[in-house]
Swiss-Prot record:
The active site is at S100. Binds 1 Mg(2+) ion per subunit. It catalyses: alpha-D-glucosamine 1-phosphate = D-glucosamine 6-phosphate. It comes from the Bacteria. Activated by phosphorylation. The gene is glmM. This is Phosphoglucosamine mutase.
């Protein structure tokens, strides 16, 4: 039997769990009530296509109304769509029910500010504290909030996107994979408005097939033959990966390089680009050779977004395809990113394969080392033995490579990532350091 009051903790992308087991409707109600107490006003609520989405978004809306705020249900809509409409409608916050690229039994709840941006961690901690209060004072009579639906939310979001970015690409042959997720509600109509020759797959959501053998996590399954470009979204459409006309993957690193170079050439670069420590070394080298300032952050779209605001960067993101194009979006938006790429193709007359040549991808080896010693991954990574092994590796790799050691924040794992021009050197160094980490972590 479930305990009456469970601890709700925000991770890197909201509160997550298996729906109806690790994440209950009661949890959603408590989070909605906490949001009403923290933000007031109107909280817009969007969701992806998971079977549990209606259940959890209804409970979230009930919590918001119980706290005296107005809940505006956007229905199935990409996360960046909820962000954009929160800002456009003057909402105090946006709530999104989604587990992104995870399988359908999982779900999650995250919040964005009224400006459509990631919440600071201190605000999430405040929501956690408010959600722990089992019996807050609640309004009655006329103080109870309303739950309303915005039926034309997809049309409003599509209009906002096309009003900001409308590449001239009539006749271009485009393949879209909507991951049987939130992109289905809006991406096809946006691309058809552009007059492209459109093929759409992953556009038959049934509540259980989101991300199943489709979308950005399975982009290698797409058959791009007969198309000029393909785009694959994740479940809530805040990321996108591309395939060029030859069927080669254009990941987030290459997309950032393409967009950053174009922005620089047009004098719209601002404070440069923001990437993470796990971005490919080839991206860092490419940006340096182009004279583009680059800020490197820890992994996580929150860190990227905060750094972009701090330095005034125009583009930033992660290899996974979670990319923020600051001129057109406040958070990662797969559809906006795809349109920005099409815009570069249209203005330059170059194919995506030509544009992707802006950077050379360095061979990369990543090993996840499970640790068993008390103190967890952080203590193992900071041990003198491991630090000496990392320093030895840095000396061997020199200017032609690098090593990144990153303890996981969610599991007892240390990630060892090595990049080098020579793949054999890359593999050898990574395996050696991973062995040291394993022995230090009690793995033998």
């Amino acid at each position: 039997m479930e305990p009456k009051e469970r601890e709700l903790a925000f991770g890197t992308d909201g509160v997550r769990g298996v729906a109806n087991r690790g994440l209950l409707p009661e949890d959603a109600l408590r989070l909605g009530l906490a949001a009403a107490r923290r933000f007031g006003g109107t909280v817009v609520i969007g969701r992806d296509t998971r079977l549990s989405g209606g259940m959890l978004s209804s409970a979230l809306a009930a919590g918001v109304a119980s706290g005296g705020a107005r809940a505006l249900d956007l229905g199935v809509l990409p996360t960046p769509g909820a962000a954009a409409l929160a800002a456009r409608l003057g909402a105090s916050a946006a709530g999104v029910v989604s587990a992104s690229h995870n399988p359908y039994p999982d779900n999650g709840i995250k919040f964005l500010s009224g400006e459509g941006r990631k919440l600071p961690q201190r605000t999430e901690r405040e929501l956690e504290r408010l959600a722990r209060d089992p019996f807050p004072e609640r309004p009655v009579a006329g103080g109870v909030g309303r739950v309303e639906a915005l039926e034309d939310a997809p049309e409003m979001y599509a209009g906002a996107v096309l009003g900001a970015l409308r590449p001239e690409v009539p006749g271009l042959r485009v393949l879209l994979d909507c991951a049987n997720g939130a992109a289905c509600a809006v991406a096809p109509r946006i691309f058809r408005e552009l007059g492209v020759q459109l093929t759409v797959v992953g556009d038959a959501p049934d509540g259980t097939n989101i991300n199943e053998g489709c979308g950005s996590t399975h982009i290698e399954r797409l058959e791009v033959a007969g198309h000029d470009v393909a785009f694959a979204f994740d479940g809530d459409a805040d990321r996108v990966l591309a395939l060029d006309e030859r069927g080669r993957v254009v990941d987030g690193d290459r997309i950032i390089a393409i967009l950053a170079r174009d922005l620089k050439e047009r004098g719209r670069l601002g404070g440069g680009a923001v990437v993470t420590v796990m971005s490919n070394l080839g991206l860092l080298k490419a940006l340096e050779s182009l004279g583009i300032p680059c800020e490197v952050t820890p992994v996580g779209d929150r860190h990227v977004a905060e750094a972009m605001l701090r330095v005034g960067a125009s583009v930033g993101g992660e290899q996974s395809g979670h990319i923020i194009v600051a001129e057109h979006a406040t958070t990662g938006d797969g559809i906006v990113t795809a349109l920005a790429l099409l815009d570069v193709m249209a203005r330059t007359g170059r194919s995506l394969s030509e544009l992707a040549g802006v950077m050379e991808v360095y061979p990369q080896v990543l090993v996840n080392v499970r640790v068993e010693r008390d103190g967890g991954a952080g203590r193992v990574a900071a041990s003198g033995t491991v630090e000496r092994a990392v320093e030895d590796a840095r000396r061997e790799l020199g200017e032609r490579g690098r090593i990144v050691l990153r303890p996981s924040g969610t599991e007892p794992v240390v990630r060892v990532m090595v990049e080098h021009e020579d793949e054999e050197v890359c593999r050898r160094v990574c395996e050696r350091v991973a062995g040291v980490v394993s022995r230090e972590g009690g793995g033998g």
